[in-house]
Amino acid sequence: MKLWKLTGASVAAALSFTAVAQAQSFVAAPAAPPAHPAAYMYGKFAEFLGEESGGEMSANVVGPEVVSLPQMKDALQTGLASVGNSLPLYFAADFPETGVAGDLALAGRNPHAMGWAMTEFVVNCAPCQEEYKNFGGVFLGAGSSDVYVLMTTKPVETIDDLQGLRLRSGGAPYSRWAENFGATPVNLPVGQTFEALSQGTIDGTMASIADMLSYRLVDVATNVLRVPLGTYHVTSNFTVGADTWADMSVEQRTQFAKAANRGDPQLTDRWAYQMPEEANAAVAEAGITDMEPSEEFLAASNAFAEQDVQARVEANPLAADFEALIGKWEGIVEEVGTDPEALAARAWDEIWSGVDFNTYGM
């Protein structure tokens, strides 16, 4: 009888150990410091992954000192990271087709619509999927910044004030906008903006108002002009390493995708809504001149943006596909609102419910 009790206890312990052993932990790399919206998103994702998998999967979130953005490709291919935040425009040579959506940056007026349009675009874009396969990753969604504005160290009230200004540009569409109005675009990593403004190397930046806090531009910028300059939406929030994805069961892939789908709008919510609100308060407190553009300035800027977008749409069917998705998701966001969980539920129905996770990303 004692032997039976001992054996039963041993079996129970073995079963318990097996259950623990089967629970999987994935190294998750937002490639961003704690204050960054990507880190916020990954914190939410860790919660969602536990919920969606019933505790069978977990995320071990690591900082940029372990995996940085430029290291993401190698990290995913070597297994240093199981899932990571990769920006296709950092690897432009690897993502020419995916990057087409980025060339329509000036179309961005609704952050959530841009993030979901990007997600649906890549999921259904065969050449984009091939690019991710060659990259060694699986795409599970995108997000978006707020609408970019102009932050400068010189007053800008009229179009003439742009003449000769050196403006940091985060991509080709912003450079085209600057050049059209007589400014000189300067390609510069966002992390170098503060130093460049401080030293007078540049006169301003076309970027998220959140950079006022993220990169302490609030300490050097003197003027903000709220001319809408589009969004940064070519993200791949949860890029799963190909080997990691292949080792998952179909059920695990589905659960992982559900967690990622819930995490995607958290990036947009933090980057495009929460942080701008905090940055706006900091701008006001610092006494920075904060202006809306004149009707003339706004009309000219919007006209150029429309012309720029249409030129890309007419030249590339993929650009036309993306433009159509922007319109679709602008309508959905207007209907659903900006609550991240409500949008994620709708996105699952619109985008992911038709995906075969037996073959997706394989």
Task: Enumerate the language-model features and the residues they cover.
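Hydrophobic helical h-region of N-terminal Sec-dependent signal peptides
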Residues: S10-A13, F17
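Generic hydrophobic/packing signal
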Residues: L15, L80, P88, M118, ...
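N-terminal secretory/targeting leader peptides
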Residues: G8, Q24-A113, F139-M362
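Sec/Tat signal peptide C-region and signal peptidase I cleavage site
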Residues: F17-A23
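Short, solvent-exposed loop/beta-turn-alpha elements that line the ligand-binding surface or hinge
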Residues: G108-N134
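Absolute protein N-terminus
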Residues: M1, A23-Q24
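Bacterial N-terminal signal peptides that target proteins for export
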Residues: M1-G8
